Amino acid sequence: MNAPTPAPSPVDVIPAPVGLLAELTHRCPLRCPYCSNPLELDRRSAELDTQTWLRVLTEAAGLGVLHVHLSGGEPTARPDIVEITAKCAELGLYSNLITSGVGGALAKLDALYDVGLDHVQLSVQGVDAANAEKIGGLKNAQPQKMQFAARVTELGLPLTLNSVIHRGNIHEVPGFIDLAVKLGAKRLEVAHTQYYGWAYVNRAALMPDKSQVDESIRIVEAARERLKGQLVIDLVVPDYYAKYPKACAGGWGRKLMNVTPQGKVLPCHAAETIPGLEFWYVTDHSLGEIWTQSPAFAAYRGTSWMKEPCRSCDRREKDWGGCRCQALALTGDAANTDPACSLSPLHAKMRDLAKEEAAETPPDYIYRSIGTNVQNPLSEKAPL
């Protein structure tokens, strides 16, 4: 009699994805220096057509995806954004519009509401208009954002304000909280900059010092207590000052997938920075095939790829080793422990790097733009 085949370890079983980040376009009227989009942005001519996006959404629903984040760039720059949103509603997918609120966003909002948009997440670069427009690189953006937010709440749509925090606006954290209350937002994200994409290029310009970060955390914690039942405040702390890393994207290939404007499917925003990974496109494979069979998704899924100290750490199934892209950028090896972790031998050096950059006079922003040959000022620096 043959022995029964042992059941696979729970961490080796491929779970169903929960969320899909649909990067519909990289076009955006804002030029934020912390943008998580890649340095080489997809042009309009390379974007997926409407029918392909509708197929992708149908396949996502079939896989068990519950949430679709309609993002970019600025998703309302797509002329088919209403049709795409309507498809989400038809499939029972919860749709979250991640928007700058400028350009044509307001003009399309009522139509999006009419076809079943579920939620709006509005980026706000600052409270003071001049500062916000300096950060976003677009004049007269703030009044447009306020008009957009007002219409969102008039329609009865739940509104989340997203404020990416850095040294240029960290003093405005109390103001972001007050603004969220004033606008009738249900949720506020106080998200300290995560240094990938354009933020990595601009790290020296964006890095706050530790005392500023600690004070912002204190302010948020006090506001959470004061506004309990009125406003939910999410807080994302900067990795460079953290004790433990975040589970990037909920764990590589465990919860989320990111479809780029040209149809490349990624386990996380910055995965393309890791050399040697083979990414599959929705034009060549179904979403289900990509989720279960793509070499890129398999590369760091689970725990078998881990080195020490991650391999034997009791947190290995909590943070999944942290961010692979950050490990590569700062240590030279994507399989190393994320240096955001206090158990990494390079953790202290990461803290020192942040301290040094925060103490220096910030350089000018390198603004996000399509078609610009960006020279990364950190590219000549050796890893930690």
Curated annotation (Swiss-Prot):
GO terms for molecular function: 4 iron, 4 sulfur cluster binding; cyclase activity; iron ion binding; oxidoreductase activity; S-adenosyl-L-methionine binding. Pathway: Cofactor biosynthesis; pyrroloquinoline quinone biosynthesis. One of its GO terms (biological process) is pyrroloquinoline quinone biosynthetic process. It catalyses: [PQQ precursor protein] + S-adenosyl-L-methionine = E-Y cross-linked-[PQQ precursor protein] + 5'-deoxyadenosine + L-methionine + H(+). Belongs to the radical SAM superfamily. PqqE family. Interacts with PqqD. The interaction is necessary for activity of PqqE. This is PqqA peptide cyclase. It comes from Methylorubrum extorquens (strain PA1). The lineage of its organism: Bacteria, Pseudomonadati, Pseudomonadota, Alphaproteobacteria, Hyphomicrobiales. The gene is pqqE.
